[in-house]
Regions:
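Histidine-anchored nucleotide/phosphate-binding helix
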Residues: 1-8, 103
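Donor-nucleotide binding loops and adjacent catalytic segments primarily
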Residues: 2-3, 168, 174-224
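Conserved nucleotide-sugar phosphate-binding/catalytic loop shared by glycosyltransferases and other
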Residues: 6-70
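Short internal beta-strands
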Residues: 13-21, 144-147, 211-216
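An aromatic- and histidine-rich active-site surface loop
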Residues: 24-25, 91-105
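Conserved nucleotide-sugar donor-binding subdomain of glycosyltransferases
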Residues: 52-90, 97
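Structural motif
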Residues: 89-90, 143, 189
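Active-site-proximal region of nucleotide-activated glycan assembly enzymes
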Residues: 109-170
């Protein structure tokens, strides 16, 4: 989305806040536009605790983490408000709630881009009253560009526009280069990529295929 906005709006400048681990990728991906992009780190404190021994979510620890995160949201929003540069015309978030409180306080449009919010996730661990501050923060958003396969009516953002399926443009020459370098005769080549991290160590992948995967994915033993 950032790339598309920069393509169609040659006078547009973006302040892009993302996890420190994504800054290098964002800089490389948007390198054609770096004169108009400011990259700064932001870490959301929402954490799902994982019990690696039993290969499941630790519900009790996750609940504690969610409640602690919600208790700190207002203060986090105050800090983000102080960092808001002059001249900003809109705040777009995927899909941290603090962004909408900041936009509301500044009198700016607050736009979400996602197919869920952390409110629905938190509802799986906490009661409605406990996560009401989270609902209230999301309700300050003006609009959600709602991807396919969304959590629908459970999303506490009132105004939604269906956004359909979205992907980056295909680079046919780059795909051809990858096939020449990695594709083996009679063996399908599968590309795996996620927005964050994903462990596949206990999930069976067909050994008759070859896999390319992005940083953050841990493949099963025997898959390189």
């Amino acid at each position: 989305m950032s790339e598309a906005l920069l393509e169609v709006q040659p006078d547009l400048h973006l302040v892009l806040r993302c996890h420190p681990g994504q800054l290098e990728f964002a800089g490389n991906y948007l390198r054609r536009f770096l004169a108009r992009v400011e990259l700064t780190p932001f870490v959301s404190q929402f954490q799902i605790a994982f019990d690696e021994a039993n290969w499941c979510i630790d519900n009790a620890l996750t609940r504690q983490s969610v409640l602690r995160w919600i208790a700190e949201l207002s203060q986090t929003a105050v800090g983000e408000q102080a960092r808001l540069p002059a001249g900003i015309r809109a705040v777009i978030s995927d899909i941290v709630p603090e962004a909408f409180a900041v936009a509301k306080q500044a009198g700016l449009p607050g736009i979400g881009v996602s197919n869920y919010t952390w409110y629905e996730v938190a509802a799986g661990f906490c009661g409605p009253g406990e996560i009401e501050p989270l609902r209230t923060m999301y309700e300050q958003a003006d609009l959600l560009l709602n991807y396919e396969l969304s959590t629908g009516a459970a999303i506490p953002i009132r105004s939604k526009i269906p956004a359909g399926l979205i992907c980056r443009p295909f680079n046919d020459s780059r795909i051809a280069e990858i096939r020449i370098r990695y594709k083996q005769p009679e063996r399908p080549l599968i590309f795996l990529s996620v927005g964050g991290a994903l462990s596949l160590e206990r999930i069976g992948l067909c050994e008759d295929f070859d896999y390319l995967y992005t940083r953050g994915i841990n493949p099963p033993a025997g898959i390189t």
